[in-house]
Amino acid sequence: MATAASNPYLPGNSLLAAGSIVHSDAAGAGGGGGGGGGGGGGGAGGGGGGMQPGSAAVTSGAYRGDPSSVKMVQSDFMQGAMAASNGGHMLSHAHQWVTALPHAAAAAAAAAAAAVEASSPWSGSAVGMAGSPQQPPQPPPPPPQGPDVKGGAGRDDLHAGTALHHRGPPHLGPPPPPPHQGHPGGWGAAAAAAAAAAAAAAAAHLPSMAGGQQPPPQSLLYSQPGGFTVNGMLSAPPGPGGGGGGAGGGAQSLVHPGLVRGDTPELAEHHHHHHHHAHPHPPHPHHAQGPPHHGGGGGGAGPGLNSHDPHSDEDTPTSDDLEQFAKQFKQRRIKLGFTQADVGLALGTLYGNVFSQTTICRFEALQLSFKNMCKLKPLLNKWLEEADSSTGSPTSIDKIAAQGRKRKKRTSIEVSVKGALESHFLKCPKPSAQEITNLADSLQLEKEVVRVWFCNRRQKEKRMTPPGIQQQTPDDVYSQVGTVSADTPPPHHGLQTSVQ
């Protein structure tokens, strides 16, 4: 079996030296771990001999006098049982799921763990059961040269189980193959019992999580040094405000709301409460693919996730508001005596946004898009306020409106002058520039007025003439009389129609 020294995630056997997974037994008694469980609970003391004072035991001496110590030892069995059903991956050591179990669920977990111990040939160590069945058993190698490794076979299994707890990559494929030939029937019973224990643990834990119960008391919480996450992967200690940075991968990591533990019970309570709201779904049965995520840096789920967006849609008007404003704006504009072009010009001069008369017209008719209506409404509202405040006194709006109204006065031509222009048009519909100048001087009109009158007269003639008939002048009619051929109709018919 693999040892902690061969694990790539634990260089220099620093994890075992940190003492985060196992707890030191100050008494140093050989059967101390087994006596606290009651009913085959002492896993690390299976070697038979007494452990050294520096060796590690699964259960800590601080829990022996406490009635909850039975649950702690049962949680050790649950750890091995759930690890066997999870393909060799241990979830955590005495995590809050098992410590928060009711006594009935804990008793069921102990019974299932006892069945696992009786049926499994590797029942010498509760932690050793976490070994993957995919690897055949090997003779225990010599103990590593660490300062705290002094045990025998039980210690080797303990190191092996701890090392397998940190190994990677995870098993995401089909279920593990049948057990080794040397151990017939051992892992089949273990898997069945582990499945029952896992179901009991989940059934007991999920209602308590959904009910929003208080986190377990301080005596049921393990104090864990900084730098370790729930998965057992190494990570940077969470900084101030880092909160859950060890999860790293978010939903891709096997971090359940009830599994996160911090340095103090207050921090653990914070994680328990916050992750319950941030990730209400049950944990995924597999680890995430890829290397372990190193936390540190930003907290996985900060309080900003549940905070409400301060930006609201209160400032955005509704369609009814826009319709009501457009109606009022049109009434006020007409009452003040401004045209739509005046408003567009005033907006461009006052606020820097030039709008045409067409845009103002479409706004009043509610023919603009909702987005453009919302953009134009505050500008028109400001213009209305400015116009209302300046009523009765000439202000900049009146000056701008006066500039917008600048257009040439319509020219009125007398009847006698119009008759002279008509007679000249019948003679020559397209006078030259010199003829226009002479005619303007004789009629005492501007040259531009005469030119525009002839242009308008030609357009009027085109509208009055059907499109299929070519307009003919009297000169053209008389010129066609001398060129009549034998197969053409008599010219007097065309002449009579032209004259009439």
Swiss-Prot record:
Pfam families: Homeodomain, Pou
Keyword terms: Developmental protein, Disease variant, DNA-binding, Homeobox, Intellectual disability, Neurogenesis, Nucleus, Transcription, Transcription regulation
Residue stretches of biased makeup (Basic residues): 270-287
Entry-linked SUPFAM superfamilies: Homeodomain-like, lambda repressor-like DNA-binding domains
DNA-binding annotation, residue ranges on this chain: 406-465
Tissue specificity of this protein: Brain.
Compartments, as annotated in UniProt: Nucleus
GO cellular component, one term: chromatin
Disordered, as annotated region: 32-63, 122-190, 231-319, 461-500
Gene3D superfamilies: Homeodomain-like, lambda repressor-like DNA-binding domains
Effect of R362L: In SNIBFIS; no effect on nuclear location; decreased transcriptional activation function; no effect on homodimerization
SMART domains: HOX (SM00389), POU (SM00352)
Cross-referenced PROSITE patterns: HOMEOBOX_1, HOMEOBOX_2, POU_1, POU_2, POU_3
Keyword match Signal: no
Keyword match Nucleus: yes
Highest taxon, organism lineage: Eukaryota
Subunit-level organization: Homodimer.
Disease entry from the Swiss-Prot or TrEMBL record: Snijders Blok-Fisher syndrome: An autosomal dominant neurodevelopmental disorder characterized by global developmental delay, hypotonia, intellectual disability, autistic features, impairments in speech and language skills, and dysmorphic features including abnormal, cupped, or prominent ears and ocular anomalies.
Protein name: POU domain, class 3, transcription factor 3
Biological source species: Homo sapiens
Gene: POU3F3
